[in-house]
């Protein structure tokens, strides 16, 4: 039995589908919510309902579980996200329950740049969570991924919404000079599933990214081409972008850019470009070749919907 936290999210739905397609039995850990969860369509899974601060619920969810994929995190909530409760305390509770249950493998999805000494909240939280996992005594695999993209992501769809909602120009933090390494979601998930049967990948931390380095400016230009929207790209200092984003996050229920994303874009976020083919035998898709999800969508309407829709 495999338990997946965050199994209804962007990565989780794809991971659950691939695991089931490969013959694994999967249980999704759902947090209590009034809203109907976005379970993977047409995929046979079990469900356990528990928040990450409910130790009794977590113990019940672990019954019969041999492998845990921990995907849940607070960054998707933007400035309203509680990194301490979800990424740090939640990971500590989940690893404790997994250790008590005799779990044999624990996967954690982290970020390039994760470090408990980081000045950036998300990367610091991920670094602290990694330490909990390494010290838990459970055989682990930590995947520090680059920016992921695909249908329903926060990255390319967020850019598409910003382009649609921008009046002729788009502000680029530091001129879009930051170097990134976007990795297609399905390639990343294939790495997660493939490594499950590889003993050499136990008790290891892997940094993985896509097969090309692109500046943020290049990425925005490619997204403009895919969506058919041209905008003047205006360089802006991150010292100005950050307080502006803080204000926008406070005004609107949701916003396509969060302070967490701006922190992530302060420095280059890359790793060895050959990591995925060398370690996993997968040739990662090029960024421009996997943007069909951006075409033919009324992004202006989606932008307004995001601004005024509450989180579940």
Enumerate the language-model features and the residues they cover:
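Mid/C-terminal beta-alpha module of Rossmann-like enzyme folds, strongest
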Residues: 194-257, 271-312
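N-terminal Rossmann NAD(P)H-binding glycine-rich loop of SDR-like oxidoreductase domains
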Residues: 1-24
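Oxidoreductase cofactor-interface core, primarily capturing Rossmann-like NAD(P)-dependent enzymes
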Residues: 15, 22, 116-227
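Short alpha-helix in the Rossmann-fold core of NAD(P)-dependent oxidoreductases
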Residues: 84-88, 107, 126
């Amino acid at each position: 039995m495999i338990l997946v936290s965050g199994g209804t999210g962007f990565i989780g739905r794809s991971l659950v589908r691939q695991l089931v397609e490969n013959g694994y039995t999967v249980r999704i850990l759902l947090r209590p919510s009034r809203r109907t969860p976005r379970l993977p369509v047409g995929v046979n899974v079990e469900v356990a309902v528990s928040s990450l601060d409910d130790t009794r619920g977590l113990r019940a969810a672990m019954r019969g579980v041999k492998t845990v994929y921990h995907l849940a995190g607070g960054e998707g909530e933007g400035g309203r996200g509680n990194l301490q409760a979800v990424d740090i305390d939640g990971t500590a509770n989940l690893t404790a329950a997994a250790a008590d249950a005799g779990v044999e493998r624990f996967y954690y999805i982290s970020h390039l740049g994760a470090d408990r000494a980081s000045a950036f909240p998300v990367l610091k939280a991920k670094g602290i969570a990694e330490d909990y996992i390494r010290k838990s005594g459970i055989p682990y695999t930590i995947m520090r991924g680059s920016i992921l993209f695909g249908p329903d992501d926060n990255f390319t769809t967020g850019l598409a919404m910003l382009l649609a909602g921008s009046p002729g120009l788009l502000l680029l933090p530091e001129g879009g000079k930051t170097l990134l390494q976007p990795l297609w979601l399905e390639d990343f998930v294939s790495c997660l599933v493939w490594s499950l049967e590889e003993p050499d990948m136990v008790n290891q931390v892997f940094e993985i990214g896509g097969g090309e380095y692109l500046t943020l400016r290049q990425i925005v230009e490619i997204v403009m081409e895919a969506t058919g929207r041209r905008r003047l790209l205006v360089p802006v200092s991150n010292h100005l972008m950050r307080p502006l984003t803080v204000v926008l996050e406070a005004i609107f229920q949701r916003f396509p850019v969060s302070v967490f994303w701006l922190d992530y874009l302060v420095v280059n976020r890359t790793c060895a470009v050959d990591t995925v083919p060398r370690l996993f035998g997968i040739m990662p898709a090029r960024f421009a070749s996997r943007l069909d999800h951006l075409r033919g969508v009324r992004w202006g309407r989606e932008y307004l919907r995001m601004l005024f829709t509450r989180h579940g």
